[in-house]
C-alpha cells in the first residue's frame, strides 16, 4: 500500500482511532540527579528514511525534557497520538510504544531503529539542541557571523543550524540533521518552539 493511500485511510479512520487510542505507560522517573536543572524543548519534527528498501517519512511534534544526564523524548503524531516515548538514563534506555510492552537496551538508538525504522541521535542531541558540539568526540564545525554554530559534523551526523531564535540565550530555532549510512540514510528536521518565560 503506498504512502498516500495509507495516509488517506489513516485520516478517514482518525475519529475511531482517537476514541480507541491507547495511552503509553506513565512517565518513568529519572535515575537520581533529581535536583539537577531541567531543560525543556518542544517543537515539530519530520524524518525521512529508508526502511526495507522503501522511502518512508514521519512527522509530528516532540517534547524533549532533560534533567542532568537523563532525557525523556515524546514523539506525537499530527493528530495527537503518542508515537513513542524514549527515556535515556546513565543506566540504560527504554522505548515505550502504544499497545506494546516497554523495550529496554543499554542505548536508545538501536531500540528506535528496530521499532520505528529511524533513530534520532539522542546522545548527540543533548548538546546539539544547546547549539554546541558534544565534548570528547571529534567534530568539524563552522560558525556564522555571530559566532554561533552554522554546521557540525560529529558521530556520523551532519548538523546544520538553519535558524536561531531571537532571544538573549543562544537557542536554535531550526536544526537539520542528516546521516548517510549507506543503504539507510536518514534526514531529520527539528523546528523548536520559542521558549516562554
UniProtKB/Swiss-Prot annotation:
CDD domains: LolB. One of its GO terms (cellular component) is cell outer membrane. Gene3D superfamilies: Lipoprotein localisation LolA/LolB/LppX (2.50.20.10). Keywords: Cell outer membrane, Chaperone, Lipoprotein, Membrane, Palmitate, Protein transport, Signal, Transport. It is found in: Cell outer membrane. A lipid is attached at residue 21 (N-palmitoyl cysteine). The keyword Protein transport applies. Residues 1-20 form the signal peptide. Its main location: membrane. One of its GO terms (biological process) is protein transport. It is a lipid-anchor. A lipid is attached at residue 21 (S-diacylglycerol cysteine). Belongs to the LolB family. Monomer. Plays a critical role in the incorporation of lipoproteins in the outer membrane after they are released by the LolA protein. NCBIfam families: lolB (TIGR00548). This is Outer-membrane lipoprotein LolB.
Amino acid at each position: 500500500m503506498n504512502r498516500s493511500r495509507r495516509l488517506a485511510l489513516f485520516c478517514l479512520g482518525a475519529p475511531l482511532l482517537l476514541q480507541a487510542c491507547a495511552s503509553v505507560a506513565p512517565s518513568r522517573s529519572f535515575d537520581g540527579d533529581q535536583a539537577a536543572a531541567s531543560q525543556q524543548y518542544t517543537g515539530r519534527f519530520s524524518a525521512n528514511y529508508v526502511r526495507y528498501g522503501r522511502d518512508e517519512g514521519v512527522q509530528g511534534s516532540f517534547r524533549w525534557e532533560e534533567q542532568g544526564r537523563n532525557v525523556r523524548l515524546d514523539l506525537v503524531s499530527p493528530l495527537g497520538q503518542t508515537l513513542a516515548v524514549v527515556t535515556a538514563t546513565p543506566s540504560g534506555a527504554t522505548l515505550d510504544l502504544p499497545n506494546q510492552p516497554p523495550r529496554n537496551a543499554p542505548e536508545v538508538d538501536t531500540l528506535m531503529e528496530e521499532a520505528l525504522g529511524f533513530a534520532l541521535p539522542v546522545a548527540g542531541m543533548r548538546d546539539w539542541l544547546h547549539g554546541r558540539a558534544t565534548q570528547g568526540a571529534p567534530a568539524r564545525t563552522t560558525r556564522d557571523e555571530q559566532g554561533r554554530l552554522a554546521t557540525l559534523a560529529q558521530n556520523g551526523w551532519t548538523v546544520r543550524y538553519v535558524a536561531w531564535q531571537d532571544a538573549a540565550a543562544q537557542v536554535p530555532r531550526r536544526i537539520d540533521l542528516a546521516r548517510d549510512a549507506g543503504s539507510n540514510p536518514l534526514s531529520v528536521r527539528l523546528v523548536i518552539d520559542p521558549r516562554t518565560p
